């Protein structure tokens, strides 16, 4: 595993070394086709790329989103416990997908059809216990309480926000975000959306409201523009100044 440039290396002030690279250009199209099929067939329940922070970070972020613990078996990936840090924190290309037990064999078969069966592993299961539990050779080697992980995950942003924004609202947001009973928004559309909407005569105008420190507004605008909207970039300061667009 190549650790050059990884988050782990950076926080330890270690520079140099070999960084990950794309070595699987020939397999990439097949991989994308399999993922697309699984998505189309609604077999994928959750998906996360292995990127900043490596495997352990991707798993933690999936737990944060679902508010569920994980029981992870490292036997398929780990030959010796001395390789544990490199395994968990390397940022080589990879993804984690969640599927139902009944869809596991089909998932393996699809990856086998493109020659990637040996690169796909069953890592474990979700758990109602609020813990990330990593096991190797039937021994518990890491046990991380989800609540403490979630607090640590948000801590740096919280400390910055306290200085930048209203500390009272920053504290409220921090407590909200780190509450494991908070399952996020679950929007329900109570009406049927027509498959075809006639917006050729005029483009509906919408404003995408953003605050300092946010990102993703350009991608959101591109998506709305693609389906016929006229998007306006609207900042919180525009509201404060009562600017008319």
Which ranges hold each PLM region?
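Catalytic core of tubulin tyrosine ligase-like
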Residues: 97
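Intein/HINT protein-splicing elements and their conserved insertion hotspots or analogous self-processing inserts
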Residues: 1-89, 100-205, 213, 222
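Conserved beta-strand elements of the Class I
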Residues: 205-207, 232
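Flexible gly/pro-rich beta->alpha loop and the following alpha-helix that scaffold active-site loops
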Residues: 223-227, 231-245
């Amino acid at each position: 595993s190549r650790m050059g440039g990884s988050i782990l290396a950076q926080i330890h002030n270690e520079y140099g070394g070999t960084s990950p690279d794309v070595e699987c250009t020939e397999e990439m199209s097949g991989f994308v086709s399999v993922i697309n099929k699984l998505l189309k067939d609604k077999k994928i329940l959750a998906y996360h790329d292995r990127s900043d922070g490596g495997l352990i970070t991707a798993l933690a972020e999936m737990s944060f989103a679902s508010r569920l613990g994980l029981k992870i078996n490292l036997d398929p990936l780990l030959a010796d416990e001395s390789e544990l840090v490199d395994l968990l924190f390397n940022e080589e290309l990879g993804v984690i997908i969640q599927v139902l037990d009944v869809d596991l064999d089909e998932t393996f078969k699809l990856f086998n059809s493109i020659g990637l069966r040996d690169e796909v592993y069953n890592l474990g299961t979700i758990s109602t216990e609020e813990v990330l539990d990593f096991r190797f050779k039937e021994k518990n080697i890491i046990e991380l309480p989800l609540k403490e992980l979630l607090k640590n995950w948000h801590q740096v942003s919280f400390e910055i926000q306290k200085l930048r924004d209203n500390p009272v609202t920053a504290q409220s947001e921090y407590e909200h975000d780190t509450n494991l009973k908070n399952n996020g928004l679950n929007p329900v559309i109570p009406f049927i959306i027509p498959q075809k909407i006639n917006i050729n005569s005029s483009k509906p105008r919408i404003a995408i409201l953003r605050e300092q420190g946010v990102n993703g507004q350009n991608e959101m605008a591109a998506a709305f523009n693609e389906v016929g909207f006229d998007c306006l970039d609207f900042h919180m300061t525009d509201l404060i100044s009562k600017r008319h667009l």
